[in-house]
């Protein structure tokens, strides 16, 4: 087995291998210091930035959810308040309607009572005027009867004539 590289025409030089190994280690150290370090720093910064963006997005999402919930609560309160206002307006309208109806009824009763009073007053005046006319007619009839001594038929005719006169004078 140790003869295999010699048979193929390959020879191993320990110094070359050591030199190449040393050069490789130096190259890796330089890459780590100048390329891998900054690259890892950039990747770390990118990772931190993405994590920060995710955290910020989650916080904004939570804030948005809170705002949505607050808006729902405010909307619910506004609906309840508007419903209360509508109910109060309906109650006030009903109350005013009842007050107007009561006022109209009271006014109607007042007008009826005033009309009744006026009717009674006019009736009393008419009765009084009628009594005066009857009294004056009675006096006139009595004076006519006294002036003339009339039989029953003549008296009836005289009364009818006076009643016609009274009817025409009205």
UniProtKB/Swiss-Prot annotation:
GO CC annotations, alphabetized: plasma membrane; proton-transporting ATP synthase complex
Main subcellular location of this protein, as a coarse class: membrane
Domain of life: Bacteria
Keyword terms, alphabetized: ATP synthesis, Cell membrane, CF(0), Hydrogen ion transport, Ion transport, Membrane, Transmembrane, Transmembrane helix, Transport
Similarity remark: Belongs to the ATPase B chain family.
HAMAP family, per database record: ATP_synth_b_bprime
Quaternary data: F-type ATPases have 2 components, F(1) - the catalytic core - and F(0) - the membrane proton channel. F(1) has five subunits: alpha(3), beta(3), gamma(1), delta(1), epsilon(1). F(0) has three main subunits: a(1), b(2) and c(10-14). The alpha and beta chains form an alternating ring which encloses part of the gamma chain. F(1) is attached to F(0) by a central stalk formed by the gamma and epsilon chains, while a peripheral stalk is formed by the delta and b chains. The F(1)F(0) complex interacts with SpoIIIJ and YqjG; YqgA is found in the same complex.
Descriptive protein name: ATP synthase subunit b
Species for this entry: Bacillus subtilis (strain 168)
């Amino acid at each position: 087995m140790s003869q295999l590289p010699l048979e193929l025409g390959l020879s191993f030089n320990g110094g070359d291998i050591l030199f190449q190994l040393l050069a490789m280690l130096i190259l890796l150290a330089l890459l780590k210091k100048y390329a891998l370090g900054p690259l890892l720093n950039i990747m770390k910064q990118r990772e931190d930035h993405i994590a920060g963006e995710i955290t910020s997005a989650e916080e904004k999402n939570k804030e948005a959810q809170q705002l949505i919930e607050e808006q729902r609560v405010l909307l619910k309160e506004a609906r309840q308040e508007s419903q209360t206002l509508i109910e109060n307006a309906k109650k006030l309208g009903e109350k005013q309607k009842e007050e107007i109806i009561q006022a109209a009824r009271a006014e109607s009763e007042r007008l009826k009572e005033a009309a009744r009073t006026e009717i009674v007053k006019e009736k009393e005046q008419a009765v009084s005027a009628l009594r005066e006319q009857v009294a004056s007619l009675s006096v006139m009839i009595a004076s006519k009867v006294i002036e003339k001594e009339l039989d029953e038929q003549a008296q009836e005719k005289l009364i009818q004539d006076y009643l016609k006169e009274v009817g025409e004078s009205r």
